[in-house]
């Protein structure tokens, strides 16, 4: 922990709210920081979350699914958010590797073939930093492969869409419609229901990905589906602008859904 973080959690001036609400049982998680990796490693890189239940269900869920799909590879974990790593370790005693620690662990264990699977949504700042770290280690392995983030390549402007974005748009919309109790998106629209998928938002140039997702929804004919962002970048996806768009389209009920890999702080606090 940094000195500032230590002041929050230790001594007479400790902040009792630093760790916030009860977020579940951390013992159900698996930091996947074991040695004895073998020749082949599949490193799953996530931003991370301090919400234990969400970490177990979402991040661990992805890691477990990958391990089941590729039993001949050792799945390991790295988080890119050091503040979350520190938070979880101080509160729960769970030690999660950051990127450098995970890469060092792979080298020390003699890994020959490294595949990196990010759970990031887009080519944003966290993805860029991950790539910078990987590039410094490439000569330590016989082969290194890095997967695209969920939404694929960014593209130059809001009109550029790709198959990855279309697949995600179809999947998240179908799940939202079903869980809302409708047989179809048109049936929801007939009830004046709109679906708003909220992303994190970013000042990175990758922010255009959110606009591209809105373009994708429109291209698919999903007229009552809107893309918003918690932090309001890009401007057209800021909450106030999305609210105005929903009102202008005549919808009277909104169902909010996270456009995030993990339902952590933003989903539980900002959206709620």
Predicted features and spans:
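Extended amphipathic ligand-handling, pore-lining, and cofactor/metal-binding catalytic surfaces
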Residues: 1-255, 260-272
């Amino acid at each position: 922990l940094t000195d500032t973080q230590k002041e929050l959690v230790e001594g007479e001036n400790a902040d009792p709210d630093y760790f916030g609400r009860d977020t579940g049982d951390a013992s159900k998680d698996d930091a996947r920081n074991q040695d004895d990796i073998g020749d082949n490693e599949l490193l799953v890189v996530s931003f991370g979350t301090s919400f234990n239940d969400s970490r177990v269900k979402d991040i661990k869920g992805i890691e477990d699914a990958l391990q089941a799909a590729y039993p001949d590879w050792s799945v390991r974990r790295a988080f890119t958010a050091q503040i979350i790593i520190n938070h979880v370790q101080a509160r729960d005693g769970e030690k999660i590797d950051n990127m450098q620690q995970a890469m060092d662990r792979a080298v020390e264990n003699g890994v020959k073939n490294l595949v990196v699977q990010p759970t990031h949504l887009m080519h944003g700042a966290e993805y860029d930093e991950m790539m910078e770290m990987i590039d410094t280690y490439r000569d330590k392995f016989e082969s290194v492969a890095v997967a695209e983030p969920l939404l694929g390549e960014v593209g130059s402007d809001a009109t550029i869409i790709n198959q990855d974005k279309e697949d995600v748009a179809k999947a998240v919309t179908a799940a939202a419609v079903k869980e809302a109790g409708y047989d179809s998106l048109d049936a929801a629209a007939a009830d004046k229901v709109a679906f708003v998928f909220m992303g994190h938002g970013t000042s990175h140039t990758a922010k255009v990905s959110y606009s591209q997702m809105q373009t994708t929804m429109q291209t698919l004919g999903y007229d009552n589906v809107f893309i918003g962002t918690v932090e309001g970048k890009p401007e057209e996806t800021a909450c106030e602008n999305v609210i105005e768009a929903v009102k202008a389209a005549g919808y009277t009920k909104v169902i909010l859904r996270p456009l995030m890999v993990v339902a952590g702080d933003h989903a539980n606090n900002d959206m709620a």
